[in-house]
Amino acid sequence: MRTLWIVAVLLLGVEGSLVQFEMMIMEVAKRSGLLWYSAYGCYCGWGGHGRPQDATDRCCFVHDCCYGKATDCNPKRVSYTYSEENGEIVCGGDDPCGTQICECDKAAAICFRDNIPSYDNKYWLFPPKNCQEEPEPC
């Protein structure tokens, strides 16, 4: 119950796709993005630098790159619509920006699910000083 309270407090004031991304990760990977991926490796969480530490961290790197390629929108604030059909996430709606961000989030959620075996607790709360290598291009 305490964990649920912490999650609720952390989500206060969070807008748009961040909440939707959390819900999508829960649906696809069956785990909380906030609790598993918000402070993992060099790229999961706010910011990102250095080289991805493993396949899970690479999911976040690719997600950051995808957000960077989204045109004319603020990825962390735009809302989007999606549905689940036959176990698949389907992005919808009339907003091109929202659709781009939804597709980025969908790819990341699938990547997290597919790379659960690579998750290593040593990368949780990974010190930024360990992320100083030259970053690779998107």
Swiss-Prot record:
Keyword Secreted: yes
SUPFAM superfamilies with a match to the protein in the record: Phospholipase A2, PLA2
Annotated residues for binding of Ca(2+): Y43, G45, G47, D64
Alphabetized GO MF terms: calcium ion binding; calcium-dependent phospholipase A2 activity; phospholipid binding; toxin activity
Enzyme class of the recorded protein, top EC level: hydrolase
Active-site residue list: H63, D105
Disulfide bond positions: C42-C131, C44-C60, C59-C111, C65-C138, C66-C104, C73-C97, C91-C102
Cellular compartments annotated: Secreted
The protein's Enzyme Commission number: 3.1.1.4
Tagged with keyword Ribonucleoprotein: no
PANTHER family per UniProt: PHOSPHOLIPASE A2 FAMILY MEMBER (PTHR11716), PHOSPHOLIPASE A2, MEMBRANE ASSOCIATED (PTHR11716:SF9)
Record protein name field: Acidic phospholipase A2 CH-E6'
